[in-house]
Structures are given as structure tokens and as C-alpha cells.
Amino acid sequence: MQVGSYKGEISIFRRENIIIGIGEHGKQVNLGADDKNGIWIALELLRTEPILKVVLFPGEEIGCVGSNSCSMDFFNDAKFVIQCDRRNGHDFIHTAGCVTLCDSSFPSPQLKQKYGYVNTTGLMTDVQTLKKRGLNVACCNLSCGYYNPHLDTEYTDVGELINCLQFVREIVQTVEHTPHEYTAPSYPLLGSWSGYRAHNPQEPEIDWEDWNDDYYANWYSHYYKRY
């Protein structure tokens, strides 16, 4: 198999709560946990939650190819949409790329606190794309326990992965239909420039890893539309 730049078989090792991948050369390699962790959560929930349906989009990291081209009719009966494709174990992405994905009441602050999730912002991802295409229910992107995505030092924290699974399961079992209409973001110029912090004056710090992913994904998508 191929994960990242490594070609070959990967052996999985677990020590306490940490999972890493070791290549045939005996060195640590990328697990592909971004976003195998999210896929695992989705498949596990299909075992226990018959009301659930799942969509797996290709090409998220090169411009949200799948979510940009899917039929939105798939979501006509959705109560809400949850994506599990965020590193670490505590981020609840309620705004992505200046697009508001849900209100603060989804789900309740008490439920977020129970599982240790904290509201924060992100950039380009599938739920943001769906929202921009007219998704009219609440959505979010959740941390699911992977760290150092795209690098050979990537690893998974199993405890955080399972915590995300349990969080999503409780949302599915307890939260009702949650309407939320898309509102186009505004980008006011602050001063003589219009960078990320100008668009988000309250944002405490720039997430450069997400910023770079977003920049190169959009460049890649634009390049291949041209040629």
C-alpha cells in the first residue's frame, strides 16, 4: 500500500494509547490516520445506529473534489451532518473558512464539555463546501485523535479516537433535526491589506498547517481546471 510518500507494507504498533506505523525499513512512517480515523468512526457507527447514513468523499485535500460535485439531494433527510476529520482530540469546528457551520447550541455546551470538545475555527473541508452549496442543516468537523498529519511522525491517540466515536454516537442518539441556513461570509478590508487576520480580527492565532493545506489545495484545483 502507499501512504504519503512511503510505498510498501506498514506494521502497526501500539504502546498504551498510542498507535504508530513502521515501514519495511524499520522506521516510523505515515499511518494515513488523516482520515482513516474518521472512516473507522463512520463504519463503527453504522453497526449500531441504523438511522445513520455515510458519505465518503474523494479529494478533500486537493480542493474538496467529491463534496464539490456530489448530489445535494443525498442530504434532503439529514438532521445534521458531522465530519470527523480534524487532528488532535478536542477541536469542535463550528466555522470553516469564515463560513458558519452551526449555531452555538449544536450540540449543547454541556454535551461538548462532557467529551472535552471546545469550539474553534478551521479552513477548507468537506462540510464547509457542502454548506456553501446550500446544506440547510447544522454541520461540524471534529477532532478524531490523529496527530502530525501528512508526516512520517503521524500517530493516533486511541483514547481520543474512541472519545470522538462516543461523542458522535451520543449526538446521533439525542440531538433532533437542527436547521441552519448558509450565510455568505463578508470580507471587510482592515487597513491596507486583506489577509487572514484582517478577515478574522478576533482569531487569536493563524493555524498555518491548515492555511497551507487550504492554499495548496486551491492552487492544485485551479491548475488542473486550467490544463
Regions found by a protein language model. Give the residues of each.
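Acidic/histidine-rich catalytic neighborhood of metal-dependent amide-processing enzymes
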Residues: K27-S105, Y115, N119, D126-V127, ...
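Generic recognition of long tandem-repeat/solenoid scaffolds
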Residues: N17-L31
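His/Asp/Glu-rich mid-to-C-terminal helical/loop segments that flank catalytic regions of hydrolases
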Residues: N148-D207, N212
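Acidic/His- and Gly-rich active-site-bordering loop/insert found
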Residues: M1-G21
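Long, low-complexity, intrinsically disordered segments
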Residues: E203-Y227
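Gly/Ser/Thr-rich active-site loops/lids in small-molecule metabolic enzymes
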Residues: L101-K112, E160-V168
